[in-house]
Every structure is written in structure tokens, then in C-alpha cells.
UniProtKB/Swiss-Prot annotation:
Belongs to the GatB/GatE family. GatB subfamily. The lineage of its organism: Bacteria, Pseudomonadati, Pseudomonadota, Alphaproteobacteria, Rhodobacterales. GO terms for molecular function: asparaginyl-tRNA synthase (glutamine-hydrolyzing) activity; ATP binding; glutaminyl-tRNA synthase (glutamine-hydrolyzing) activity. Allows the formation of correctly charged Asn-tRNA(Asn) or Gln-tRNA(Gln) through the transamidation of misacylated Asp-tRNA(Asn) or Glu-tRNA(Gln) in organisms which lack either or both of asparaginyl-tRNA or glutaminyl-tRNA synthetases. The reaction takes place in the presence of glutamine and ATP through an activated phospho-Asp-tRNA(Asn) or phospho-Glu-tRNA(Gln). It is an enzyme of class 6 (ligase). This is Aspartyl/glutamyl-tRNA(Asn/Gln) amidotransferase subunit B. Keywords: ATP-binding, Ligase, Nucleotide-binding, Protein biosynthesis. The gene is gatB. InterPro entries: Asn/Gln-tRNA_amidoTrfase_suB/E, Asn/Gln-tRNA_Trfase_suB/E_cat, Asn/Gln_amidotransferase, Asn/Gln_tRNA_amidoTrase-B-like, GatB, GatB_C_1, GatB_Yqey_C_2, Gln-tRNA_amidoTrfase_suB_CS.
């Protein structure tokens, strides 16, 4: 397999009115666990159900109802940890995070502060060919999601939908290793890609199944290196947390604004206040939500209703044996086995379905040609029509059949595109459609020679020009292909034209 090595990108430098500044970003990603049932109850997790229809007595904190851990959610967290090359903790525990909010019926959230199920891991975030940032994962813990408060249905009333209450979340906490807005968005995209490959979260940001809390601070050049040497976070400046970001574009915009806001405060001699902020995409700015709480503000303590969670190494090993090939490994293999470029490999492995489609087309064929057709023809058409790979009218077998006809010399590249169009709109077997439509390339050298002789005889002036400038021989090739209705084999035409003109 191809061994890919990378250089570390330089941090983003922002020029203030008085000084240069660098960005420091850490992220907490809340990923909804792909599970049919909630973390501590059997209630459904179906999105878009009638309000308060997916709620059990446990979810709405009825007296006497006790939580029971969903083993599948635990397995999904372990699977995620393995996918992020993280330490799996065989003993973890649940804690109560105490705060009042209308959509939190228990009056506390069950989380894992002191003993998370997953420890330190890492994510490699590519920022261009040969350039990547290694982002360290501090921890992954399981916790409950809250419900949804609705304030815009009535001018005098607020409503609460508890369907989301108790749904399992994985909170994936990074170290402050991200150094720019583009890196932050790329980190979320890479994490989402890995989770989708693993099948542990669908990554649907629009539905709120993947949300990001972004911690932003600014420091002077050299301060980050001092932090690395001492692990003293004071070198990184005072951070502000931007909550519940559900768009890559908004994440970048919010970081850009927040960095400028903090720089302006510091250069005016002020101090940045540690707080939680929200991003308003309509105004393109962050605004204060509340002062930033510390762990002690939530009065964490071990949940007395739940025993420590103990798992066996043999079970972890069993999950490890079922792990799929992940994006980085698949990319390296595609480049090594099929000869595709770094860029093409990234495109082809972006989604698991797309990678599987490409591999089905490329197996036993020219990998570069397969990549070209899948990316330019198939993906181009899908994007134009707003379709997913699963909705593609042309199957991998059909596209592979088109490439086989090109390889055998039966059809030209132009014919292949016409054939692809017919398959897209009408379907059918490529070979049968090509035969029925008379889409067969002329490879008979005698017929091609006759056509070349006729074109040369009719254009003596062009012959002299081509002999003086061999590049003009292409004109004859074009005329012959045109005369044969596009059916003449271009390679054969080129060879015969060159021979006839004495080039």
C-alpha cells in the first residue's frame, strides 16, 4: 500500500491594527449515535416524528423509572474510538450534569465527565496535496441529548418536544490543535466522513445529528510554541465557545468574526471575557449567550442509578475485526492499485457509496480511465441533477461495459459519451445498445485509407501546409473522422494520415 507522508500546514496569521495574531481552535463535536433506540430507553430515534410521540417514561423522568444502558450505543462508541485510533477504556462511568432547562425533564443530563468510554486518539486532516494537520482527540464520551424548545409557534407560549430527549450522543473533544477557519471546517468534514464509513453517525448536520461547539482564542506568534513546551494554556489566550454550529460555512464565518472581535478588544487594551456565544448567520457575527461555565458550576457527581460500565477486551477485539477500511487507507490503496491522482482519490473516497461504485467499475480495467469517467461523467451528471450515487440511473456494471467497448476498440470516446447518455435516459445493456444504434468504430484500415486518399486528393493546398508544418495534419484527421460519421478509429486515422503525408 502507498505510504502517504505529509507536511504540517502553517497557522493562519491575522494582521491586527498593531500586531500579528494567530488563531487557536479546539472543537467539541456532538455526534448522534446511529441507533434505533435511545441511550437509556427503548424509545425510537426516528427523525421528524410527531412531537412527543417518541418518548418513554424514562425519557420524561417519571418517578421510579430507571435508566437501562443500550449496549448497541456502547458498541458504536467503541467502534468510533477504534476508528480514531483511540484508547478504549474498559471501565467507564456515568455522571449527572445538573442544570435546569425546560427541555431537560430530569433536571440533569447523564454524561461522562470523570471516566469517559474512549480516551486519546487522532484525526489526520488534509489541507492540500502533501499537507495535513494531525488533530489530537482528547476524549469521547457518551451522553444524552436534550429535547427541543419551540418559541415561534405562539407569541405568548413556548412549547417543548421531548422526542430528542435521551437520544445517544458521542461528544468528541479535540485538543487545541486547529490553527485556522479552513482547518476547522476540514476537521469536521473529515470526522463526519470517518463516522459515516464506520456507520456510527449519519453526519446529517441539517437535522442536527452532527453539531459543533467551537472554542476560539487568539495569541501572539510564538505563544503557541510556548504552550507546546509547557502545556500552559494561559499562553493561548482566553477562549470563547461558539455553540451549536451545524454548517461548515458558518463554522468558518463564525471563527473569522470571533477572531477579529477578540483582536480588536486586546489591541484596545481590554480583556477577552470567557463566555459562550452564538453565531448569527444573517448578521455574520457572534453574540454573547451566557458566561462560560466551569465543571463545578454543573455539580457533577456519579449517577447513583447506573453502575460503572465494564466491558471486556475480547468484546473490543471482536468489534475491531468488523471494522471497515477507512478513508485514509482506502485513498492510499486506490492510488497504489489503480494509479489515480491524490485529488481523484480524495473525490472517490469522499463517500463510501462512491468509493464502492468506483471500485466496481475499475476492477480489472484501466483505473485512471475509470476514475475519469466516474468523476467527470457520472458525478458531474449526478451533481447537475441533484442525485445521490444510490439514485444513479447508470450502474457500475453498465459504466464498466462502456469502458470495455472503448478498450476493445469497438467504440470511440465520443461514441462512448453518446452511449452513456442513452444508458442514462433509457437504460439497457451497453453492448446491445451500441449494436442496435450502429455505434461501431471503423477499424478497417482499407476503408480508412480510402477516406484519407479522398480528403488528400481534394485538398492539395492543405497537403503542402501540413508538410511544412506537421501540426496541421490534425486537420486531415478531423476531416476523415467527420467523413466517416465519427466512426473511424482516431489512432488508426492518425497513423494513416502521417504515412500518406510522409510525416
Amino acid at each position: 500500500m502507498l505510504d502517504l507522508t505529509y507536511e504540517t500546514p502553517k497557522p493562519k496569521v491575522i494582521a491586527g491594527a498593531k500586531h500579528d495574531w494567530e488563531l487557536v481552535i479546539g472543537m467539541e463535536i456532538h455526534a448522534q449515535v446511529s441507533s434505533n433506540a435511545k441511550l437509556f430507553s427503548g424509545a425510537s430515534t426516528t427523525f421528524g416524528a410527531e412531537p412527543n410521540s417518541n418518548v418513554s417514561f424514562v425519557d420524561c423522568a417519571m418517578p421510579g423509572m430507571l435508566p437501562v444502558i443500550n449496549d448497541f450505543c456502547v458498541a458504536q462508541a467503541v467502534r468510533t474510538g477504534l476508528g480514531l485510533k483511540a484508547q478504549i477504556n474498559l471501565v467507564s462511568a456515568f455522571d449527572r450534569k445538573n442544570y435546569f432547562y425546560p427541555d431537560l425533564p430530569q433536571g440533569y443530563q447523564i454524561s461522562q465527565l470523570y471516566h469517559p468510554i474512549v480516551g486519546e486518539g487522532e484525526v489526520l486532516v488534509e489541507m492540500g496535496p502533501g499537507v495535513a494537520r494531525l488533530v489530537r482527540i482528547e476524549r469521547i464520551h457518551l451522553e444524552q441529548d436534550a429535547g427541543k424548545s419551540i418559541h415561534d409557534m405562539d407569541p405568548n407560549l413556548s412549547f417543548v418536544d421531548f422526542n430528542r430527549t435521551g437520544v445517544a450522543l458521542m461528544e468528541i473533544v479535540s485538543r487545541p490543535d486547529i490553527r485556522g477557519p479552513e482547518e476547522a471546517a476540514a476537521y469536521v468534514a473529515k470526522l463526519r466522513q470517518i463516522l459515516r464509513y464506520l456507520g456510527t453517525c449519519d453526519g446529517n448536520m441539517q437535522n442536527g445529528n452532527l453539531r459543533a461547539d467551537v472554542n476560539v482564542s487568539v495569541c501572539r506568534p510564538g505563544d503557541y510554541e510556548r504552550y507546546q513546551a509547557t502545556q500552559d494554556f494561559s499562553h493561548l489566550g482566553t477562549r470563547c465557545e461558539i455553540k451549536n454550529m451545524n454548517s461548515m460555512r458558518f463554522i468558518q464565518q463564525a471563527i473569522e468574526y470571533e477572531a477579529r472581535r477578540q483582536i480588536a478588544i486586546l489591541e484596545d487594551g481590554g480583556k477577552v471575557v470567557q463566555e459562550t456565544r452564538l453565531y448569527d448567520p444573517d448578521k455574520g457575527e457572534t453574540r454573547s449567550m451566557r458566561s462560560k461555565e466551569e465543571a463545578h458550576d454543573y455539580r457533577y457527581f456519579p449517577d447513583p442509578d447506573l453502575l460503572p460500565l465494564e466491558i471486556e477486551q475480547a468484546w473490543v477485539d471482536e468489534i475491531a475485526t468488523s471494522m471497515p477500511e477507512l478513508p485514509d487507507a482506502k485513498k492510499a490503496r486506490f492510488m497504489a492499485d489503480y494509479g489515480v491522482t491524490d485529488y481523484d482519490a480524495n473525490v472517490l473516497t469522499a463517500e463510501l457509496d462512491a468509493a464502492a461504485f468506483f471500485e466496481a467499475v475499475a476492477k480489472g480495467r484501466d483505473g485512471k480511465q475509470a476514475a475519469n469517467w466516474v468523476i467527470n461523467e457520472l458525478f458531474g451528471r449526478l451533481n447537475k441533477q441533484g442525485l445521490t450515487i444510490a439514485e444513479a440511473p447508470v450502474s457500475a456494471a453498465q459504466l464498466g461495459g462502456v469502458l470495455d467497448l472503448i478498450a476493445s476498440g469497438e467504440i470511440s470516446g465520443k461514441m462512448a459519451k453518446d452511449l452513456f447518455e442513452i444508458l442514462w435516459t433509457e437504460g439497457g445493456d451497453p453492448a446491445e445498445v451500441a449494436a442496435a444504434r450502429g455505434m461501431k468504430q471503423v477499424t478497417d484500415t482499407g476503408a480508412i485509407e480510402t477516406a484519407v486518399d479522398e480528403i488528400i486528393a481534394a485538398n492539395p493546398a492543405q497537403v503542402e501546409k501540413a508538410k511544412a508544418n506537421p501540426k496541421l495534419a490534425g486537420w486531415f484527421v478531423g476531416q476523415v473522422i467527420k467523413a466517416t460519421g465519427g466512426k473511424a478509429n482516431p489512432a488508426a486515422v492518425n497513423q494513416i494520415v502521417a504515412q500518406k503525408l510522409g510525416l
